[in-house]
Regions:
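Charged, often glycine-rich, active-site loop that binds/positions anionic groups
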Residues: 237-247
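Active-site/ligand-binding neighborhood in enzyme catalytic cores
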Residues: 1-84
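Short, surface-exposed acidic
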Residues: 1, 11-14, 126-130, 220-227
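Internal hydrophobic alpha-helix adjacent to the cofactor/substrate pocket in enzyme cavities
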Residues: 279-292
Length: 292
């Protein structure tokens, strides 16, 4: 039920790859081992221990910006056309007006969006395949609380359909620097599709509904709430349906003709990968490019 709620599809339609290696090492034996011995016997299907930045995961990307130099980044700059000729990407158009000539393109755009922007367009077969692959969208609802702590859990999961959300986490439990010493926060994840009513609904109404559930769960009281907000994240996760590999292989076979194109990230590779995978992949791309 949790998987169906998370992905929006019956589990019978999902590929085992959607576990993202979290099932690796999972067996009756390891389950018993962890139950008896606890955290010291965590196996590879669970997070186990890991390093976490003092001020949140965003620090990684702040440091990348500092290293590359802020003037080298363009914000509010939507790619609206990707022009190619023969076996090379020649230029990209920004906001339908500014054209940039390029030597090499690295894309983490959702595959379907990338293909839609290609000029000339791909064959109809490729476009039809790209329209059939799906992404799951997420709404984050954030609560800032005048309370020292909620509990010690890294994450809390909610498979019951009576709740809109699937997961709640308390950032302070990752790093104590994520909140003042006498305050905390909760981040609530709501998976959906952009066509769902919940995505299209008034966000203040959504916040109030989630807040009511959290009050009923006794996570905090109304007078402990300092502030709240919500963020929409489109194309947060690729949905790996059964036999998705055949579809993606055809798309990759088509895109392999471009000798100056690299794809990366969850959306670009259509893979349920993680930040450390993306960092490694990005480094490999840059190292290979610097050798050319």
């Amino acid at each position: 039920e949790y998987s169906k709620k998370l992905w929006g599809l019956p589990t019978s339609n999902l590929s085992p790859s959607i576990s993202g290696n979290r099932l690796k090492g999972l067996s009756i034996y390891t389950l018993i081992l962890e139950t008896i011995f606890g955290a010291k016997k965590k196996t590879k299907h669970l997070d186990g221990s890991f390093y976490y930045p003092d001020y949140g995961i965003g620090i990684l990307f702040d440091e990348l910006v500092n290293y590359c130099g802020l003037p080298n980044f363009k914000t509010e700059s939507k790619v609206t056309k990707i022009t190619h000729l023969e076996n090379s990407i020649k230029s990209i158009t920004i906001n339908d007006k500014d054209t940039l000539i390029i030597n090499h393109l690295i894309s983490s755009m959702p595959l379907g969006v990338f293909l839609d922007y290609l000029n000339p367009p791909p064959p109809k077969e490729i476009l039809d395949i790209s329209k059939s692959i799906k992404f799951r969208d997420i709404i984050l609802v954030c609560f800032f609380l005048d309370k020292k702590s909620i509990n010690n859990n890294g994450s809390m999961y909610f498979p019951d359909d009576k709740y809109l959300f699937t997961r709640i986490y308390e950032p302070k439990n990752r790093s104590h620097n994520m909140s003042p010493i006498d305050k905390t926060s909760l981040i609530v994840e709501i998976p959906c599709f952009k066509s769902d009513d919940i995505w299209l609904s008034n966000q203040n109404d959504l916040i109030e509904k989630v807040k009511a559930d959290l009050l009923n769960l006794n996570f905090f009281t109304d007078n402990q709430l300092i502030d709240s907000c919500s963020y929409k994240i489109p194309n947060a996760y690729p949905i790996l349906e059964l036999n998705f590999e055949k579809k993606i292989r055809k798309i990759f076979d088509y895109l392999s003709r471009f000798d100056n194109l690299n794809l990366t990230g969850r959306n670009g590779l259509f893979a349920y990968t993680h930040i450390h995978d993306h960092m490694r992949n990005g480094r490999e791309i840059i190292n290979n490019y610097s050798k050319v």
